[in-house]
Amino acid sequence: MSVIRALHRQLVTKERSAEEIAREYLERLAQLEPQLKSFITVTEELALQQARAVDARIRAGEAIGPLAGIPLAVKDNLCTQGIRTTCASRMLEGFIPPYESTVTARLAAAGMVTVGKTNLDEFAMGSSTENSAFQRTANPWDLTRVPGGSSGGSAAAVAADQAVVALGSDTGGSIRQPAAFCGVVGLKPTYGLVSRYGLVAFASSLDQVGPFGRTVEDVALLLQGIAGHDPMDSTSLKVDIPDYSQALIPDIKGFKIGVIRDLLGEGCGEETRAAVQAAIQHLQELGAEILEIDCPSFRYGLATYYIIAPSEASANLARYDGVKYGLREPADSLLSMYGKTRAHGFGPEVKRRIMIGTYALSSGYYDAYYLKAQKVRTLIKQDFLKAFEKVDVLVSPTTPTPAFKLGEREDPLSMYLCDLMTIPVNLAGLPGLSLPCGFADGLPIGLQIVGNALQESKVLRVAYAYEQSTDWHKRRPPLGQPSVKEGQGSDPGQPQAKRRSGKRSKKSKS
């Protein structure tokens, strides 16, 4: 059952109050935080304030929506007015935005309870959340392994019941890959379906905000709360938003599902391949027609992405110069200040990608690299369009392997290969979802479901049908009992963590 629906029922029947629920999640968050390090900032005071406001509405007899009173975690690259937004970078360590991102504003208006800002790879550049300037987040299933990235803090928080749902951003797989590693559901919406206003930019033509949840329905409900046109975002689509909960039908008889042959071959681990093939067989047993699909351009997706994304990043990150906001290193000249600020403010991976992007955009190399990459991007889009002439959705593994050990992949190329299966979806701007489909040595494996543009409903329907006929989503990491799904108490055996203030003021600290 959806966690959101279960809690909503408890709230409207007055079985429990929003403040009680918020306190239990905050307690569990504090208990597990020394082990997981999912959060950069915990907004306890804000959460309790928002929860009390929901309780006041209920006492007044006001009807509340399904998201009201639900604990939410927010990736720390989404601007939150009065609460620092660091992007896990020394460059923005003390930055307190004077405005609110559209998605967080919409969820606050819906009555959600923000428990904190989650850890990520610096400026969302990474696949393991090891590139954070502040801390390394651990995977709740195995504390010696990564949670994925760049939205690793959000995925870990949902998997460990530190929050009911969370927001992440996905540029090359940064929602789907950590969702797979942490055994939760994560959705990257169609590019432009969700506003990017207030999202600190990495690669503007690829970035998209999306939801994490323990179930497909939780993700659908959160997507409902954030989707829709925003005049503050020039890339926002003017389209009607369907009721995504209406797509949650456990019947896919007659659906045509394409298996991306290119993503099940070389580079895919044996255990992952076996789990995904079993999931495909299960979808067939549910009545879907399975077709094999060739997408030959996908093999060039990784190289294409690592030209386009760093090129856009090099332009976007040029604004961090020590003049307007963020870190400023003392220096005896303007040029020296630029150099010292950027040298001390950015971590190694961010510097690497800025250099790659600057090189690709430089005179004499623009045509050979950037322009050619854009042409290949068009070919990838065309391969998807051809595939969707034959099928309703496409499926593949989300990641080549389950979560790897912390510190295991020091070579940048081996880290980049983690996003091999998710990157083409970003290049084409399509919706993609990951949900659990098995385990290997106690670690979750993710199934990726991809739809045509604005076909989130089809993606959610197939995911829901699979989820409702399996029990992978019901498994929990070995971190004690969940805090409030069924009104259970939190695990008293975990150490207490220091609480941190989260007032909407310039005094917010972590």
From Swiss-Prot:
Residues 471-510 are annotated as: Disordered. The active site is at K75 (charge relay system), S150 (charge relay system), S174 (acyl-ester intermediate). GO terms for cellular component: glutamyl-tRNA(Gln) amidotransferase complex. The lineage of its organism: Bacteria, Bacillati, Cyanobacteriota, Cyanophyceae, Synechococcales. Allows the formation of correctly charged Gln-tRNA(Gln) through the transamidation of misacylated Glu-tRNA(Gln) in organisms which lack glutaminyl-tRNA synthetase. The reaction takes place in the presence of glutamine and ATP through an activated gamma-phospho-Glu-tRNA(Gln). PROSITE patterns: AMIDASES. HAMAP family: GatA. The gene is gatA. Residues 497-510 have a biased composition (Basic residues). Its EC number is 6.3.5.7. It catalyses: L-glutamyl-tRNA(Gln) + L-glutamine + ATP + H2O = L-glutaminyl-tRNA(Gln) + L-glutamate + ADP + phosphate + H(+). Heterotrimer of A, B and C subunits. One of its GO terms (molecular function) is glutaminyl-tRNA synthase (glutamine-hydrolyzing) activity. One of its GO terms (biological process) is translation. The keyword ATP-binding applies. Belongs to the amidase family. GatA subfamily. Pfam families: Amidase. InterPro entries: Amidase (IPR000120), Amidase_CS (IPR020556), Amidase_dom (IPR023631), AS_sf (IPR036928), GatA (IPR004412). It comes from the Bacteria. This is Glutamyl-tRNA(Gln) amidotransferase subunit A. Disulfide bonds: none annotated.
